């Protein structure tokens, strides 16, 4: 899974009818005595209005590691990236992530077909934690239909990691094996 961009943040804009925002690349850090507020700044994709998502509210300055505090103060791009993709921050602050157009599947399938006699072990690696169904990954990667994927799993031609279900969403690296046509 190759990264093509960060997910859009879906929340209503107060100025226009659009719901898609993108990170501005900046944080706002406000200290009031010993208490600190940190917000991730977003821009509306249509009108450009800036809005903020609370990252930390009224936390004691000493409760944040100095390196983390410095990352907020210097608008560290990797911290902006990590918080933009944070499903827990999205859930906590009431928005959702739109992963449309943020990834593409790179595969060597022109060099392998499920009809070939050899078995193959496939490593699926994620540059982005895109939540995608296992079934869809297999369809795209092997260039076969949903029904064919289900048949291959039922016949154990596709062997998935034990706790994995075709309908489950994955976002971390995993391996699976496709048994060749000659090994059935």
Regions found by a protein language model. Name each.
Residues 55, 162, 178-180:
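Conserved "cap/hinge" positions at secondary-structure junctions
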Residues 174-184:
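Long, intrinsically disordered, low-complexity Ser/Thr/Pro-rich regulatory/activation regions
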Residues 1-134:
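Ferredoxin-like alpha/beta domains used as RNA- or RNAP-binding modules
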């Amino acid at each position: 899974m190759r990264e093509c961009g960060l997910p859009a943040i879906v929340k209503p804009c107060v100025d226009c009818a659009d719901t898609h925002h993108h990170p501005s690349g900046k944080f706002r850090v406000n200290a009031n005595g010993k208490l600190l507020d940190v917000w991730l700044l977003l821009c509306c994709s249509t009108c450009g209005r800036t809005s903020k998502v609370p990252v930390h509210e009224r936390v004691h300055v000493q409760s944040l590691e100095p390196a983390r505090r410095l990352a907020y103060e210097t608008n560290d791009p990797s911290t902006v990236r990590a918080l933009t993709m944070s499903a827990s921050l999205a859930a906590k602050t009431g928005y959702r992530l739109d992963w449309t157009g943020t990834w593409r599947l790179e595969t060597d399938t022109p060099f392998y077909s499920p009809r070939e006699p050899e078995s193959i072990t496939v490593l699926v690696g994620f540059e982005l934690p895109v939540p995608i169904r296992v079934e869809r990954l297999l369809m795209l990667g092997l260039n076969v239909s949903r029904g064919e994927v289900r048949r291959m799993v039922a016949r154990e031609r596709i062997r998935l990691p034990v706790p994995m279900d075709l309908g489950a969403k994955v976002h971390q690296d995993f391996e699976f094996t496709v048994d060749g046509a000659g090994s059935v």
